């Protein structure tokens, strides 16, 4: 049977804006109040997804969240008509309105943690939506995320969906952005790497001092239990607190893995060699640990360019390719390193550059925009086929974006009642295009 690693990219929502909501994310904060272009953002994401599909990759799309989130605004005391709720919130609590209008669900690396059937005791693919409790604007996502994932991976014979973890900082969970999987072949049992920022229940354990550690060891271990993983299939690694304090808010900003390759910065982890030895003990295959030294790429350059927030994909030919943002080309140190990497004795043979600047300016590169799902051909056949990228879906979604999206949006525009109508009309049509059913609150 054939096996694949599919990428499910987040479709950028109609309210994509730069509100600077993500403390600890340097790009998000430094670009606050820029004028955004939701139409361009959505099209940049679609272009990247279509390019991967054209390379022979299994490529899907995940629908965005409903925004503005009037349900949350009403829960916190704003009332009256929809227009009045927006008007009140804009006047009395503009930052809360901004949080309820974020299009951050585009970064589906934070949507969930996924364990393939080759690793789990029950032989099913497991999904746990991330609770994202560290950030208000993301903490309102998990329920709808769960509905969208269930509508996309709907066959219970193959897919096991869990609820998100308890909504408490002890179980802070940021999903696949802090998780990667190493294996020989996608269909073989592998080792899942769970990267955490702190131990919530151990006050003496190392933790960052400036920025929050969004992922806890307790959350990572809970997900591993839910997914029915054996101890021999898991390695729990602490991210270096010092790099979190330099803007590395998720592990996918400082490391990325694919099959038998782990590509990471030398400052990425604590006790690096000890953990590499553990991976080698648990995974009996030839492994490539590509460590990027600070002398060649400083942490600041890695964060600005998102060198590690790249995708490493294996093409049908077996060749590994890095999918990088054009920002990596524009940074001399990073571009020089990537060119050098191609001359080294590793499976990575090519770097492809994509313009995802609308996402990058909000702090999300190519790897943020995708959720990896390793599947066999029967599982791929069981996926909602209307969510899989092909010529027809690409054309239809581009027309849909042209029809419904603005090409200019400021934070002041978020209080425009017309934006609610535009967004709901667009999402209602999208659920019909992608055959998702009533996943949104306004449809229920």
From Swiss-Prot:
Top-level lineage group: Bacteria
UniProt KW keywords: Arginine metabolism, Hydrolase
UniProt enzyme class: hydrolase
Key word Transcription regulation present: no
Reaction catalyzed: N(2)-succinyl-L-arginine + 2 H2O + 2 H(+) = N(2)-succinyl-L-ornithine + 2 NH4(+) + CO2
InterPro entries: AstB_sf (IPR037031), SuccinylArg_d-Hdrlase_AstB (IPR007079)
Coiled coil: none
Pfam family, one: AstB
Family: Belongs to the succinylarginine dihydrolase family.
Functional description taken from the UniProt entry: Catalyzes the hydrolysis of N(2)-succinylarginine into N(2)-succinylornithine, ammonia and CO(2).
PANTHER family registered for this protein in UniProt: N-SUCCINYLARGININE DIHYDROLASE (PTHR30420:SF2)
HAMAP family: AstB
Name assigned to this protein: N-succinylarginine dihydrolase
């Amino acid at each position: 049977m054939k096996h694949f690693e599919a990428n499910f990219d987040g479709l950028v929502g109609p309210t994509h804006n730069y509100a600077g909501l993500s403390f600890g994310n340097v790009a998000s904060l430094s670009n606050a109040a820029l004028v955004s272009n939701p139409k361009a953002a959505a099209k940049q994401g679609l272009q990247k997804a279509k390019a991967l599909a054209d390379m022979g990759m299994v490529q899907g799309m995940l629908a965005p969240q409903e925004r503005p989130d009037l349900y949350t605004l009403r829960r916190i005391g704003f009332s009256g008509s929809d227009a009045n709720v927006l008007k009140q919130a804009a006047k009395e609590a503009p930052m809360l309105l901004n949080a309820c209008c974020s299009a951050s669900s585009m970064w589906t690396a934070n949507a969930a943690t996924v364990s393939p059937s080759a690793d789990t005791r029950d032989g099913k693919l497991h999904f746990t939506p991330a609770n994202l409790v560290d950030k208000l604007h993301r903490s309102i996502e998990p329920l709808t995320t769960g509905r969208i994932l269930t509508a996309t991976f709907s066959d219970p014979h193959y897919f096991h969906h869990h609820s998100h973890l308890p909504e408490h900082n002890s179980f802070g969970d940021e999903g696949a952005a802090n998780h990667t999987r190493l294996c020989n072949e996608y269909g073989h049992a592998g080792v899942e790497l769970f990267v955490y920022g702190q131990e919530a229940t151990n006050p003496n354990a190392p933790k960052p001092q400036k920025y929050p550690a969004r992922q806890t060891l307790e959350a990572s271990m809970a997900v591993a239990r839910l997914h029915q993983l054996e101890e021999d299939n898991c390695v729990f690694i602490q991210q270096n607190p010092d790099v979190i304090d330099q803007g590395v808010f998720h592990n996918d900003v400082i490391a990325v893995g694919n099959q038998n390759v782990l590509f990471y910065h030398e400052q990425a982890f604590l006790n690096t060699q000890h953990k590499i030895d553990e991976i080698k003990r648990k995974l009996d295959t030839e492994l490539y640990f590509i460590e990027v030294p600070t002398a060649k790429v400083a942490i600041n350059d890695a964060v600005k360019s998102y060198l590690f927030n790249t995708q490493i994909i294996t093409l049908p030919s077996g060749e590994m390719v890095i999918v990088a943002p054009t920002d990596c080309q524009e940074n001399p140190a990073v571009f020089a390193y990537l060119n050098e990497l191609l001359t080294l004795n590793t499976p990575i043979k090519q770097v492809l550059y994509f313009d995802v600047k609308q996402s990058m300016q909000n702090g999300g590169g190519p790897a943020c925009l995708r959720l990896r799902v390793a599947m066999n051909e029967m599982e791929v056949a069981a996926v909602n086929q209307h969510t899989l990228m092909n010529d027809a879906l690409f054309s239809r979604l581009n027309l849909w974006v042209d029809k419904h999206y603005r090409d200019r949006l400021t934070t002041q525009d978020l209080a425009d009642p017309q934006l609610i109508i535009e967004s709901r009309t667009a999402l209602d049509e999208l659920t019909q295009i992608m055959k998702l059913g009533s996943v949104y609150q306004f449809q229920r």
